[in-house]
Regions:
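Acyl-donor-binding surface of acyltransferase catalytic domains
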Residues: 1-77
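Acyl-donor binding region in acyl/amide transferases
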Residues: 2-6, 16-28, 32-34, 113, ...
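Generic detection of intrinsically disordered/low-complexity segments and helix-coil linkers/edges
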Residues: 36, 87-90, 195
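Conserved active-site tyrosine of GNAT-family acetyltransferases
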Residues: 37, 93, 187
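Alpha-helix boundary/capping residues
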Residues: 40-41, 96, 100, 190-194, ...
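A conserved beta-strand-loop-helix scaffold within acyl/acetyltransferase catalytic domains
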Residues: 44, 48, 61-62, 69-151, ...
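Active-site/acyl-donor-binding loops of N-acyltransferases
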Residues: 47-62, 176-230
Length: 230
């Protein structure tokens, strides 16, 4: 395993303030490295790179599902394990990207090796979550939905089922990606959530909420660096 510190994707200050930021990634990673990387705040991205950041995870022993998600799940058919990127998945993915207004689209094939948690409503696929087993833990990489049934809060239903499947598989933690910006505030309401400070896993939700709110006050990376898109 090799760590790389990329200062072409960072920024710094030294005239009136001291600041140095750069991207930290792990390469040449072996399967035996995955547990260490996850437990030390790294997340694997669609390129197969492991990036250090403000990771989040759920302690499955402390997780409690909500009554609302449980009730709404009874109106759905939920399957787990199919890893075929078929036309239905592509349709949901394209609808998801359009709904979110993303400037970029992560290649759907990046998730071809993942298990899928699928949610059907009235026989139609409405959402997919891409997940993987990593030793004694599970990782949830991406949730997508066509948002045609917003009344069913499929994101909440999926999150509940992810945790229940993780519990059934004997997982200690479910890793759920980074925790940046106000779009991730919902994570702070999950029972058992922990976040990576850079040195330890913390349960201080007040601090995490403050950090997320601060993230959303920053200019985007293109405005900050001018070359971060490369």
């Amino acid at each position: 395993m090799v760590f790389r510190f990329d200062h072409t994707r960072g920024l710094g200050l030294m005239t009136n303030d001291d600041l140095s930021l750069c991207e930290v990634t792990a390469h040449e990673v072996l399967p035996t490295d995955h547990d260490w990387l996850l437990s030390n705040g790294f997340c694997e991205d669609y390129r197969g790179f492991w990036t250090q950041g403000r990771s989040t995870r759920i302690d499955i022993s402390k997780y409690k599902e909500s009554k609302t998600a449980r009730r709404l799940s009874k109106r759905c058919v939920i399957t787990f394990g199919d890893n075929v990127i078929d036309d239905d998945v592509i349709r949901v993915y394209e609808s998801y990207c359009k709904h979110k207004g993303f400037d970029r689209m992560i290649p759907i094939d990046a998730y071809s090796s993942c298990n899928q948690l699928r949610i059907y409503v009235d026989g139609i696929l409405r959402s997919v979550t891409f997940m993987s087993d990593v030793s004694e833990n599970m990782v949830s990489y991406q949730f997508i939905s066509d948002y045609e049934r917003a009344d069913l809060s499929l994101g909440s239903v999926s999150q509940m089922m992810e945790c229940l499947f993780a519990r059934q598989h004997g997982a200690q933690y479910l890793y759920i990606g980074f925790g940046y910006e106000e779009s991730c505030l919902y994570k702070t309401r999950i029972h058992g959530l922990e976040w990576w400070t850079g040195s330890v896993w913390s349960s201080d939700m007040s601090k995490l909420i403050s950090l997320m709110n601060g993230d959303s006050m920053l200019p985007n990376c293109y405005q900050i660096t001018g070359y971060a898109q490369n």
